[in-house]
């Protein structure tokens, strides 16, 4: 008898099984190929805009992805560095082979975790409660909780031109029996599609005609726990399609599964295939292609931006039309893959299914796309399954606390009909949810759960103390416009002042940096750069942060007004049939959750608030 069984060893499965095992739960990870644990099935990179935030938040609570990325990273960049800190994002090219090996080895060393190479064929469900699983080897395993992290494997169907192949990804069997079994549970399910790009032999690429894209000169680690960080970095390259490429693709639209009706699933809006781009943006004469090394030895390159399901011979033809790729040899062809998913409105915020008790879902099965989105869901599912076993309150992150909270709330409340990708624009309070303050926001949860060490938490507390001391100093001290103070400002390269201002106003200037902050007071010279960056950020955005915190308080009031689990919305007079239907479908746990549902009007919310408050008074 296991406490937790995790089905699938992708990024969600890695984090789910690790979290449960590290929280003291006897855990079993079942996966089709042990060698493929933690595999990056598509692009060789972790992070990016908003995705980097997710990894930082995961790391802040003790997840594995950030640490593994730092160990396997071969190029480190901060995206949007010229823009505000709220929308900057860390992105790391990884050695895909090394990443996989590190992930597998970290799991194999966990004392409470067993791993078995088996494919689950069915669940054992009694009275709407999951009790265990059955596998293709006819083994039966019982567990208190089961977490589905099946990725693209549920009835996975690969498309290349007119050809179709049942598979979870190339070279691995689709999970047909489990996919069919889930259809019998009365869950709302759908079909989604994603795709991948060709990989090319490095010796066949003419790099001399490509634009080089180097990593940052002073790379920053993803994980605050990474020690002795000094990575070897490789360049990426940029190529461009041209009108000849586009003509080849257009001439073969009739062979594209995307357009022939062969593919039924909905693809990712923000990561379209090259044929979809040519069709949708027919006026563009060129599209960027990012040429990314797959490993540190750089023998193969991933052609990012060239995702396709066109026939093999067409892929070769269109790639040869790109400058620098005239003699390119494709080592692995691109393809599209369709798979089953469960509509995420079927889930609670804990990621447990509403209809099947003790059954949790994480990753692409919930309608998301991306390694990072999958990893954080797996982590939260593993945590909440473990907390439930211990009869403890679940960990549900609010929208103002974390991008993880935004992601899960969007899925559970709004649902999705297309692969969901995280963006900074999805977060209402993104100035509060910066990458670098993730440890200050979420470290306490990781520590309480036993996923962060005493040493790690002490480091976080030290930064928090430095931040508090630094801000108190800046807000309490004043600059008067005398000759001595103005001379000091001029020595820093700053403009003089003509009226009394506090230090925070000086530090808030765009030109004020860490080196200048150190000269402001000896206290700052003793602080580490992490603390100093946070003091600068808080000082520069002080006014806007205060505004967002006021908005958060309003949201909290709505979030604290809970709607009873089996609430009868029909009993509320004044609500239209449409509103009642939507509320019954989504079953929002709070008034705030109800406010996020499309079509729920402010008037309906007012009526609902008044009714629930009256019922609470009567009780």
Swiss-Prot record:
It is found in: Cytoplasm. SUPFAM superfamilies: FAD/NAD(P)-binding domain. Keywords: Cytoplasm, FAD, Flavoprotein, NAD, tRNA processing. PROSITE patterns: GIDA_1. InterPro entries: FAD/NAD-bd_sf, GIDA_C_N, MnmG, MnmG-rel, MnmG-rel_CS, MnmG_C, MnmG_C_subdom, MnmG_C_subdom_sf. FAD binds at residues 8-13, 120, 175, 364. GO terms for biological process: tRNA methylation; tRNA wobble uridine modification. NAD(+) binds at residues 267-281. Its cofactor is FAD. NCBIfam families: mnmG_gidA (TIGR00136). Belongs to the MnmG family. This is tRNA uridine 5-carboxymethylaminomethyl modification enzyme MnmG. It comes from Campylobacter jejuni subsp. doylei (strain ATCC BAA-1458 / RM4099 / 269.97).
